[in-house]
C-alpha cells in the first residue's frame, strides 16, 4: 500500500482564500480589519521565525498584526500590564504569547491574563475547559487544524481507534478532547509508555507529537492507518523530518502528513481562523 499525502500546505492556502474573501466583505460593509497582537519575549531565533510566519499569514488575508517585542529581562508584571492594555484595546481581537517563554516566567500565569475571548491560541483554562465540556469556543490551533485536515479529506473518524503519542498541553491533551468529540476511541500515550509498539500497531488513526526525529518506525504502523505527524525536527545534515519515519510509514499507511508541509501550515491558518472567529464574536456582542 502507498499512502495518500495529506497536504496541509494546499488546504491552508484554500482556507486563507476563504478568510481573505470574508475579511474583504466585512471591510466593504464598513467594518474594520481584524487585529492580532503577538507578544514575543526575548530573542529566541526559532520563535522569531514563527512570529514572522504568522505576520505574513495575517498580511495575506487582510488581518492587521501588532508585534510587541519585550526584552528577555521583562518581568511577569510588565507582561501582565501589556496584556491588560491589549485586553481593553478594541482594535485587537486576538492575543497570543509566542512560546516558549524564558524559564523564569510562569507560562500558566501569563496565559491566564489573556481575556478568554481574545485567547486565539486556545490555551486559557476557560477555553480548554469549554473543549473538555464538549462546547468549544476558541480551540487550540494544532489540534483544531488536524481535525480540519481530516475533515477536508473526508476521513470519517467515528469509532476509529485513535492513538495519540505525546501528552503536552499544546497538542496531546487538546487533541485527545477533539478526537473524543469526533467519536473516536482514544488511547493517550507518550515516549515512555510501556509496550508503545502494541498501541501503535492497533491504531486506525495515529497522531504523534513528541519532538524526536524518526521516533516511530514505519514497521509499527498498521496497514491502512491514518498517520498525522506533528513533529518537526532538524537533523545534523540540515534535513527537516517528523517524529515518524516517513519513507517506511508511507508504504503502510492509507494517509500520511509530510514534514514539512503537513500539520505546520494548518496550525498557522487555524490561528487566523480563531482570530476571525473572535472578531465576529466581538461585532456580534457590540
Curated annotation (Swiss-Prot):
The reaction(s) this protein catalyses: (6R)-5,10-methylene-5,6,7,8-tetrahydrofolate + NADP(+) = (6R)-5,10-methenyltetrahydrofolate + NADPH; (6R)-5,10-methenyltetrahydrofolate + H2O = (6R)-10-formyltetrahydrofolate + H(+)
Binding site for NADP(+): 166-168, 232
CC terms in the record's Gene Ontology section: cytosol
NADP in keyword set: yes
GO molecular function: methenyltetrahydrofolate cyclohydrolase activity; methylenetetrahydrofolate dehydrogenase (NADP+) activity
Coiled-coil stretches noted in the UniProt entry, renumbered to this chain: none
Keywords, sorted A to Z: Amino-acid biosynthesis, Histidine biosynthesis, Hydrolase, Methionine biosynthesis, Multifunctional enzyme, NADP, One-carbon metabolism, Oxidoreductase, Purine biosynthesis
Associated pathway: One-carbon metabolism; tetrahydrofolate interconversion
Gene3D superfamilies: Leucine Dehydrogenase, chain A, domain 1 (3.40.50.10860), NAD(P)-binding Rossmann-like Domain (3.40.50.720)
EC code: 1.5.1.5, 3.5.4.9
GO biological process, alphabetically ordered: L-histidine biosynthetic process; methionine biosynthetic process; purine nucleotide biosynthetic process; tetrahydrofolate interconversion
Function: Catalyzes the oxidation of 5,10-methylenetetrahydrofolate to 5,10-methenyltetrahydrofolate and then the hydrolysis of 5,10-methenyltetrahydrofolate to 10-formyltetrahydrofolate.
Family: Belongs to the tetrahydrofolate dehydrogenase/cyclohydrolase family.
Subunit composition and interactions: Homodimer.
Name by which UniProt lists this protein: Bifunctional protein FolD
Gene name, Swiss-Prot/TrEMBL: folD
Amino acid at each position: 500500500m502507498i499512502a495518500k499525502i495529506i497536504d496541509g500546505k494546499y488546504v491552508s492556502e484554500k482556507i486563507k482564500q476563504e478568510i481573505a474573501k470574508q475579511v474583504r466583505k466585512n471591510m466593504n460593509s464598513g467594518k474594520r480589519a481584524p487585529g492580532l497582537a503577538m507578544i514575543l519575549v526575548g530573542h529566541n531565533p526559532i520563535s522569531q521565525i514563527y512570529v514572522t510566519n504568522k505576520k505574513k499569514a495575517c498580511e495575506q488575508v487582510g488581518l492587521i498584526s501588532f508585534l510587541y517585542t519585550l526584552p528577555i529581562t521583562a518581568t511577569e508584571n510588565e507582561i501582565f500590564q501589556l496584556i491588560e492594555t491589549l485586553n481593553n484595546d478594541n482594535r485587537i481581537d486576538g492575543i497570543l504569547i509566542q512560546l516558549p517563554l524564558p524559564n523564569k516566567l510562569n507560562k500558566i500565569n501569563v496565559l491566564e491574563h489573556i481575556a478568554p475571548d481574545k485567547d486565539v491560541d486556545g490555551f486559557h483554562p476557560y477555553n480548554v475547559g469549554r473543549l473538555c465540556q464538549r462546547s468549544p469556543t476558541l480551540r487550540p490551533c494544532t489540534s483544531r487544524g488536524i481535525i480540519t485536515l481530516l475533515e477536508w479529506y473526508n476521513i470519517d473518524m467515528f469509532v476509529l481507534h485513535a492513538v495519540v503519542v505525546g501528552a503536552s498541553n499544546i497538542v496531546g491533551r487538546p487533541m485527545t478532547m477533539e478526537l473524543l468529540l469526533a467519536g473516536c476511541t482514544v488511547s493517550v500515550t507518550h515516549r515512555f509508555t510501556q509496550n508503545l509498539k502494541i498501541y501503535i500497531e492497533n491504531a486506525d488513526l495515529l497522531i504523534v507529537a513528541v519532538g524526536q526525529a524518526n521516533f516511530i518506525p514505519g514497521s509499527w504502523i498498521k496497514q491502512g492507518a491514518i498517520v498525522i505527524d506533528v513533529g518537526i525536527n532538524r537533523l545534523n545534515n540540515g534535513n527537516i523530518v517528523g517524529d515518524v519515519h516517513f519513507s517506511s510509514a508511507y508504504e503502510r499507511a492509507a494517509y500520511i502528513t509530510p514534514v514539512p508541509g503537513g500539520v505546520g501550515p494548518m496550525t498557522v491558518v487555524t490561528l487566523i481562523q480563531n482570530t476571525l472567529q473572535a472578531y465576529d464574536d466581538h461585532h456580534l456582542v457590540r
